[in-house]
Swiss-Prot record:
Sequence positions bearing N-acetylmethionine: 1
Taxonomic source organism: Homo sapiens (Human)
Chain intervals for the UniProt region annotation (Disordered): 257-282
Name of the encoding gene: RMI1
Identification of the protein by name: RecQ-mediated genome instability protein 1
Gene Ontology terms, MF aspect: nucleotide binding
Length: 625
């Protein structure tokens, strides 16, 4: 009987008995080798089949390069595998236990803390659940490398299986992201091993790689007599292994190792002059398996975690504006805030000083056509029964929301008027391109300021190096930078609301957005509730939302939600409503009717309203006043 017919019968038998598929060329070569080993003695077909199977068990399937698993199985995120597949285990690890404790156990090291702790480790109670084993297998059919996970306990598998063991997986096997979920009914151990894998995938070596321990490397250190003395690194008694301190030290030193196969090979055989060399052990050294040094860890990027929904989808400019607003509010708490300007000799300064008790303040910074800066600071004071509060200082033209930037000199128009035996100065400062930045909108306006004529004096100082102004304002004074009250349509700014310091609960409209949620959505007493922090770009405010708003966003009231749990379809709609509510809160930027309680420094959002053309017209009218 010729080799081809014997190979054909052996192939049929392997497939029928063991579901093993092999390439015909390998099978014929294997039969020829078996016949030569038996001195060309005629073997029966059964004997030949048995010896072929034994040779297959000892063969590295990577050498056969015979594909078995379906094409593209690693690219499919989720699926099911059907049929019979004879695969090879390259390595396996119990991932339910720490790799460090496993490797110390293999080396016979005692790592318990009984000698240094006051109490011995507490033994688990009989009724406590014991941690179950979970093996992670590295499998291959010779072409595809895939992982297998012990999804349910498989008694026939254990960590002592030698690398190269062949197993048969069969039946319906689910897989996720390149990992086969193995169960007892899906696995059969066929046996075998591969000598070439015994060292590379030894259990201790696999665990050592997991904890970042380097392979055995020979390093050379020169001495003072120009002789190179080789030193074997980490070559210890395999029964004991390195101590805990040495292992930790080796992990640090691993950052400085370099993986260069050529130079490493040379160091294994010669380490200096011919008359001063010491032979080194190299039985376990294989250049192709030297672990590359771990890259030095990059400093982790700082991340800001926002509560409940990650409502941080704002631009950098908005964030900077909010930060400046917070700083401005902190400055408002001071009663007296000096303004100090450092100037060069070539700057001209005009100071308008007046002498009442309380003040309204604004600062004008103008840029002339010749690019020289001219700073004009107006300080005004009005009598108001010793009641005063501090105004924020203007540090520079970029930080202040009270700044007016223009490209032409300011024209001053002084008009004197008599009213109730008191004469006021009206200073009207106009510019063709005056602009005022507030809430990220450029508001063109004329700044009109009323000051008293009595005791007024105007002085020009060209050689001044330091100017200090004391700024005060009364509780009832008008904020000239905004020129509005709490009920000016279409909305009011939160900073104006805070500065007015209302004595009782006040209901106003603001145009704001949610900065972050400060609490979870909850139901109590049959109503929805959630807390948040809102801002309009000038200030922050903690708010609660009324039940009606949340019910409209979710689409379900609390009683309806409880009722929907009995109906799967309704409950699914409720879950969709929750997701819609989350999206709406993230994108929420509209007019909010809020009820502000000054005693709690908190507000209740009563209604939401989109901005329409009427609001736009009201805003234009307010700006043109």
């Amino acid at each position: 009987m010729n080799v081809t017919s014997i190979a054909l019968r052996a192939e049929t038998w392997l497939l029928a008995a063991w579901h093993v598929k092999v390439p015909p060329m390998w099978l014929e070569a294997c039969i020829n080798w078996i016949q030569e080993e038996n001195n060309n003695v005629n073997l029966s077909q059964a004997q030949m089949n048995k010896q072929v199977f034994e040779q297959w068990l000892l063969t590295d399937l990577r050498d056969l390069e015979h594909p078995l698993l379906p094409d593209g199985i690693l690219e499919i995120p989720k699926g099911e595998l059907n049929g019979f597949y004879a695969l090879q285990i390259n390595s396996l690890v119990d991932v339910s236990q720490p790799a460090y404790s496993q490797i110390q156990k293999l080396r016979g090291k005692n790592t318990t803390n009984d000698l240094v702790t006051a109490e011995a480790q507490v033994t688990p109670k009989p009724w406590e659940a014991k941690p179950s084993r979970m093996l992670m297998l590295q499998l291959t059919d010779g072409i595809v490398q895939i992982q297998g996970m012990e999804y349910q306990p498989i008694p026939i598998l254990h960590s002592d299986l030698p690398p190269g063991t062949k197993i048969l997986i069969y039946g319906n096997i689910s897989f996720r992201l390149g990992v086969l979920l193995l169960k007892p009914e899906n696995v059969k151990v066929l046996g075998g091993e591969v000598d070439a894998l015994l060292e590379e995938y030894a259990q201790e070596k696999v665990l050592a790689r997991l904890i970042g321990e380097p392979d055995l490397v020979v390093s050379v250190i020169p001495n003072n007599s120009n002789e190179n003395i080789p030193r074997v690194t980490d070559v210890l008694d395999p029964a004991l292994g390195p101590s805990d301190e040495e292992l930790l030290a080796s992990l640090d030193e691993n950052d400085e190792l370099t993986a260069n196969n050529d130079t490493s090979s040379e160091r294994c055989f010669t380490t200096g002059s011919s008359s001063n060399t010491i032979p080194t052990r190299q039985s376990s050294f294989e250049p192709e398996f030297v672990i590359s040094p771990r890259p030095k860890e990059e400093p982790s990027n700082l991340s800001i975690h926002v509560m409940d929904g990650e409502l941080d989808d704002f631009s950098l400019e908005e964030a900077l504006l909010l930060e400046e607003t917070v700083q401005k509010e902190q400055m408002e708490t001071k009663e007296l805030q000096p303004l100090t300007f450092n100037r060069n000799a070539d700057r001209s300064i005009e100071r308008f000083s007046h002498n009442p008790n309380t003040t309204n303040n604004f600062s004008l910074t103008c840029k002339n056509g010749n690019n020289n800066w001219s700073e004009k600071n107006v300080s005004e004071q009005m009598t108001n029964e010793d009641k005063s509060f501090g105004c924020p200082s203007v540090r520079d033209q970029n930080r202040s929301i009270f700044s007016v930037h223009c490209n032409v000199p300011l024209a001053h128009d002084f008009t004197n008027k008599e009213k109730n035996l008191e004469t006021d100065n009206k200073i009207k400062q106009t510019s063709s391109s005056d602009s005022h930045s507030l809430n990220n909108k450029i508001l063109n306006r004329e700044v009109v300021n009323y000051v008293q004529k009595r005791n007024s004096q105007i002085s020009n100082e060209n050689d001044c190096n330091l100017q200090s102004c004391s700024l005060r304002s009364s509780e009832n004074s008008i904020n000239l930078s905004i020129a509005m009250d709490l009920y000016s349509p279409p909305f009011v700014y939160l900073s104006v609301l805070m500065a007015s310091k209302p004595k009782e609960v006040t209901t106003v409209k603001v145009k704001a957005f949610i900065v972050t949620l400060t609490g979870n959505l909850s139901s109590s007493g049959g109503i929805w509730s959630i807390t948040a922090k809102v801002s309009d770009g000038t200030a922050y405010l903690d708010v609660d939302f009324v039940d009606e708003i949340l019910t409209s966003l979710i689409g379900f009231s609390v009683p309806e939600m409880k009722q929907s749990k009995k109906d799967p379809l309704q409950y699914q709609k409720f879950l969709e409503g929750l997701q819609k509510c989350q999206r709406d809160l993230i994108d929420l930027c509209c007019l909010m009717t809020i009820s502000f309680n000054p005693s709690l420094s908190k507000a209740m959002v009563l209604a939401l309203q989109d901005v329409n053309m009427e609001h736009l017209e009201n805003l234009k009218k307010r700006l043109n006043k």
